[in-house]
């Protein structure tokens, strides 16, 4: 699944004390890609089918978020405030002033949070299948098949359970190669990765029980007022964040969305299912005046 090595550079930068791995490719206006969560997630595995096309038009930055991929793992906490701060520190560390941002799942929450905190620095954003934003807007949904598969991997990290996680993420099972499974499995079981998962679980538990933390997490009163040009993309076959329970209600709560794109044959990682259509929709939106 690897991209041709002549199309990108894999680099590290010190983002306010956090050694952060990122991929950079192309030239032009900067686009920051923010991957979602789950075992073995990284900038490359989240966006490898999209970076080469986006890099034909933009300078693309795909970071490994703190606690993921080859980026450092925090010692004591890994929740949304830490992830949001790390994203802001990364943008500063690579000296970007104004950016386009694209985020998937909990990465889309990070993008929206960055846009709320720094609205003058985000020119446009693309939010892809984000149950995290749905939760921040007060929406609820039943435990999903994808989340159950992820919990099974957390308790029993095997290659078979990694395959089940990936089958929950995408609709096109042909894209789940042995190489992809092995690569994500190695990232998910490296030193520090399991600790990161435990830190995230601890944060989610606190989020359920601490009203003050939930208030900090909430976007209910701020996100609907955001006027940064934004589109949302959702897969009709999403098994992590079902479109009927989260996507359509979220669309109706955000009056300033430029568009809500439904991909009929995509799961949670739309960008890795209907790849050509996704790339075209995103490029057209970002290039439009």
Predicted features along the sequence, with ranges:
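Conserved alpha/beta-hydrolase catalytic His-Asp/Glu region
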Residues: 157-222
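Active-site loop/oxyanion-hole signature of alpha/beta-hydrolase fold enzymes
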Residues: 52, 62-102, 279-283
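Flexible "cap/lid" loop of the alpha/beta hydrolase fold
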Residues: 116, 123-164
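N-terminal cap/lid segment of alpha/beta-hydrolase-fold proteins
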Residues: 2-19
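Conserved loop-alpha-helix segment in the C-terminal half of the alpha/beta-hydrolase fold
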Residues: 220-266
């Amino acid at each position: 699944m690897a991209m041709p090595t002549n199309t990108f550079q894999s680099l590290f930068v010190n983002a306010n004390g956090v050694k952060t791995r990122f991929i950079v490719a192309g030239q032009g206006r900067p686009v920051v890609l923010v991957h979602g969560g789950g075992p073995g997630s990284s900038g490359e595995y989240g966006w490898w089918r999209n970076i080469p096309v986006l890099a034909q038009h933009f300078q693309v930055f795909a970071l490994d978020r703190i606690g993921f991929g080859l980026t450092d793992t925090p010692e004591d906490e890994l929740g949304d405030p830490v992830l949001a701060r790390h994203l802001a520190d990364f943008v500063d560390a690579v000296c970007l002033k104004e950016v386009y941002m694209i985020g998937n799942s909990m990465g889309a929450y990070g993008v929206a949070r960055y846009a709320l905190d720094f609205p003058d620095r985000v020119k446009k954003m693309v939010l892809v299948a984000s149950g995290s934003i749905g939760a921040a807007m007060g929406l609820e949904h039943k435990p999903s098949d994808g989340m159950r598969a992820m919990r099974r991997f957390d308790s029993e990290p095997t290659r078979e359970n990694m395959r089940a996680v990936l089958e929950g993420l995408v609709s096109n099972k042909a894209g789940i190669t042995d190489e992809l499974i092995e690569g994500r499995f190695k990232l998910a079981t490296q030193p520090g990765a399991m600790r990161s998962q435990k830190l995230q679980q601890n944060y989610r538990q606190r989020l359920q029980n601490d009203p003050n933390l939930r208030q900090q997490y909430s976007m209910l009163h701020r996100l609907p007022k955001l006027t940064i040009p934004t589109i949302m993309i959702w897969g009709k076959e999403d098994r992590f964040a079902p479109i009927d329970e989260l996507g359509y209600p979220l669309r109706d709560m955000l009056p300033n969305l430029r568009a809500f794109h439904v991909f009929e044959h995509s799961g949670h990682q739309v960008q890795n299912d209907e790849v050509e259509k996704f790339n075209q929709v995103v490029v057209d939106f970002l290039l439009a005046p």
